[in-house]
């Protein structure tokens, strides 16, 4: 999707793309219009369902508490199969921090189905994405565990991807997002469609 933007196939990426330092080497981003942590999900019958940890894991914090939480996650998931979707910040996180067996999926739907069928032990994804699946009959046995994961390589939130050099277009998006955040529009839309406020 990024190469097609760079090559002029379209002007903006509006696909829930996280703003990361790595991506900013290739494209520009608008201000973030949404923020959402990542979490781990498993079946309610899994021993992982009772795993407890700190509420939040901020990857911008390099304290011993952060490394301790990551270590505890790795100990709990040792030898297990963990799913992530391809070319996402979740795959980046798993490659950097997890010692588990990683299974990479082309789509979230395929990963959801494998988790529900017990073909993987857990998955890592955005909270809202998994919660939508949990509200279906296929995901009714799925539960979350572990901390809210954010910061660091998980990025600064979700923004519109824009070609580097398209300063006028970026300015238009930045203003529209700032106005929509200030007047409550982003919060209202977020509550309507996600059931929670994901405004930055």
Model-derived features: positions:
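Short, Asp-centered acidic motifs that coordinate Mg2+ and/or phosphate
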Residues: 11-12, 121-122, 159
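Short helix-initiation/N-cap motifs at beta->coil->alpha
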Residues: 1-3, 67-69, 103-117, 128
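Periplasmic-binding protein-like
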Residues: 35-42, 127, 131-175, 196-200
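A ligand-binding cleft/hinge motif common to bilobed small-molecule-binding domains
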Residues: 16-26, 93-96, 113-117, 121-154, ...
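Acidic, polar ligand-binding/catalytic clefts
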Residues: 1-72, 146-153
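A local structural motif
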Residues: 76-81, 95-110, 119
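Solvent-exposed loop/turn segments at secondary-structure junctions
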Residues: 1-2, 12, 18-22, 46-48, ...
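Ligand-binding clefts/hinges and TM-proximal coupling segments of bilobed small-molecule sensing domains
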Residues: 53-79, 89-97, 174-200
């Amino acid at each position: 999707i990024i190469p097609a933007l760079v090559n002029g196939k379209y002007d903006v990426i509006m696909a829930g793309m996280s703003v990361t330092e790595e991506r900013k080497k290739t494209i520009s981003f608008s201000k973030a219009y949404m923020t959402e942590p990542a979490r781990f999900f498993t079946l309610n019958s899994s021993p992982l369902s009772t795993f407890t940890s700190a509420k939040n894991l901020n990857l911008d914090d390099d304290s011993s508490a952060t490394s301790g939480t990551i270590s505890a996650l790795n100990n709990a998931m040792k030898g297990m199969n963990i799913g992530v979707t391809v070319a996402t910040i979740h795959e980046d996180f798993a490659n950097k921090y997890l010692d588990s067996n990683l299974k990479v999926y082309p789509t979230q739907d395929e990963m959801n189905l494998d988790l529900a069928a017990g073909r993987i032990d857990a998955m890592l994804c955005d909270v809202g994405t998994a919660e939508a699946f949990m509200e279906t009959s296929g995901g009714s046995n799925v539960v979350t565990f572990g901390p809210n994961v954010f910061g660091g390589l998980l990025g600064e939130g979700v923004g519109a991807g824009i070609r580097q050099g398209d300063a006028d277009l970026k300015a238009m998006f930045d203003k529209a997002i700032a106005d929509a955040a200030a007047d409550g529009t982003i919060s209202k839309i977020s509550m309507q469609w996600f059931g929670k406020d994901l405004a930055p």
